[in-house]
């Protein structure tokens, strides 16, 4: 009997877990993967920018660094860049109780070039116009700076340039498991033989997201689910 489900949604949001655990199968806790994260936005920011993309940017966390884009939501952040960095963000939340995503809002400029550009006289320009003209920062990117930085930093050229290149964005939690594209956790490989059959339940095979592994992207997820499903099916 082959068994393959969406780990978070299959059989009523992971209800298969206690069914197998009761039979002695070792299962790692299911965790959201390729998921969004909660951020404590101000009401003004959330109402104005929810649904807007932030691009191009570079995100970094725990030594990992990647360029891409993401979307602002009413409750936080989601999108390709966030999904790619979801594992280290989740791990930081689990081990440290907090996590910070650092953003480079001007990936096309070095810190030195950005500092020089922002040091040019503003004249009668507002801060918003100065950021737009000298740094290419406007819209939601400018909104993020105002949301996350104290006024003193916004008005100090060197500090502002450094913040644009390394803006700290605290995240408070993963989105719920049933919103995640995929999951980490699942049936431990030690519970399976080389044919993906449960050692304690002969004739029962596991595949797909039921297995304890984590896909870096949706594409890898589908490929591995198809591959493990086929491998298990060959022994049924």
Please describe what each predicted stretch is.
Residues 6-7, 36, 78, 182, ...:
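Glycine-rich phosphate/pyrophosphate-binding beta-alpha loops
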Residues 16-24, 223-236:
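An active-site-proximal "capping" alpha-helix that borders the catalytic cofactor pocket
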Residues 1-43:
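Glycine-rich loop(s) and the adjacent beta-strand/alpha-helix scaffold that form part
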């Amino acid at each position: 009997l082959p068994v393959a489900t969406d780990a978070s949604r299959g059989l009523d949001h992971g209800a298969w877990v206690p069914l197998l655990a009761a039979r002695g199968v070792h299962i790692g806790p299911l965790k959201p993967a390729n998921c969004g994260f909660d951020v404590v936005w101000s009401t003004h920011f959330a109402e104005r920018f929810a649904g807007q993309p932030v691009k191009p940017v570079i995100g970094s966390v725990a030594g990992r660094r990647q360029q891409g884009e993401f979307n602002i939501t009413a409750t936080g952040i989601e999108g390709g860049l966030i999904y790619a960095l979801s594992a280290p963000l989740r791990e930081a939340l689990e081990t440290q109780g907090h996590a910070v995503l650092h953003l480079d809002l001007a990936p096309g400029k070095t810190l030195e070039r950005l500092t020089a550009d922002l040091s040019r006289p503003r004249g009668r320009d507002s801060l918003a116009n100065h950021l737009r003209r000298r740094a290419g920062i406007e819209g939601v990117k400018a909104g993020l700076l105002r949301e996350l930085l104290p006024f003193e930093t916004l008005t100090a050229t060197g500090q502002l340039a450094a913040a644009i290149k390394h803006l700290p964005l605290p995240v408070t939690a993963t989105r719920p498991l049933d919103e995640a594209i995929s999951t980490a956790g699942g049936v431990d490989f030690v519970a399976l033989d080389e044919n993906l059959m449960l050692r304690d339940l002969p004739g029962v095979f596991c595949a797909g997201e039921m297995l304890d592994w984590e896909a870096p992207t949706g594409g890898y997820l589908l490929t591995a689910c198809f591959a493990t499903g086929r491998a298990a099916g060959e022994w049924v």
